[in-house]
Amino acid sequence: MLSRRDLFDARLQLICLDDAGTKDGHSEIDFVDAPSDLVPGVYEGGLKTWECSLDLVDCLHSIYGPDVANKIRGKRVIELGCGTAIPSIYLLHSIFSADPGQSAGDVIVHLQDYNELVLRLVTLPNVILAWYMSPASSAFRASAGTEAEQAEDAEPLPPADPTQPGELPITPGLKAAFLESLRTYRVDLKFFSGSWATLDVDKPGRGPYDILLTSETIYRTASLQSLVDLMRRATSGWARGGSLDEAASRLTLSDTDGLQRLADEPYLCLVAAKLVYFGVGGGVNDFTEAIERPKDGKRLGRVQTVLERNRGVKRSVMRVVWESL
């Protein structure tokens, strides 16, 4: 079970801020209180947790199993349109729950969202909660608990139990302990805001990425090509050698062993989405067509469904295998 910041708490923070910013004539509080979850080009719905991000966690667990922390050691991970970043939080919590003494290589985790506000209000707080609810924060919790008992005005720390609601004070001591854990567990964490077209994944220290994750990002056809281009550039360093058909043939739908074999692939590009986004225009078919049957006739890769949800709103997790460059 994972902890995340409540939207109400984020809203309260904005209300209490005297210098809440604006974007294109909209105040930051407007995004939280908006009746719509989407204001194209202004706010892309990242403050809320959507179903497909949970599907992506299920898929990652099926692929990597309980030893996920060790299996992603030495890898570069990026989550595009991360919002509350639940898939990345799952990976980070797994790392913080493992033995740091067995760390064989750094883990690079990059989180991107259109809105810098989203990164501040929910993404980073959720990352901190993933650490706080793990064994990695035990030393801090023990020392801070003793200090809180000695100081009358100190705020008590909540239990490290995701089933219980609570308020976590962000103190200088907590920030220092969190940063120290990043070093101890060898996690390189970075945040990026802005459109997909502005994210330069070719800069030193960024791509190519071994694991690319994105969920609920293919809902708008107008931005689909920009997303596909970024996904391909972000993993392009691995899309070399071997045939596309050979790579795609290593997995069949509903093949549990096949899902586990994905952990050994050179790169993993996973997209979680609803079959159709009513009222917006995008969906799985448009995404698949943009990759397999683009307008210029040059196939970019192949899209495979690796997980399906047929109850309620139909959803799926897709794996993208790119053509060799």
Predicted regions and their residues:
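S-adenosylmethionine-dependent methyltransferases
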Residues: M1-L325
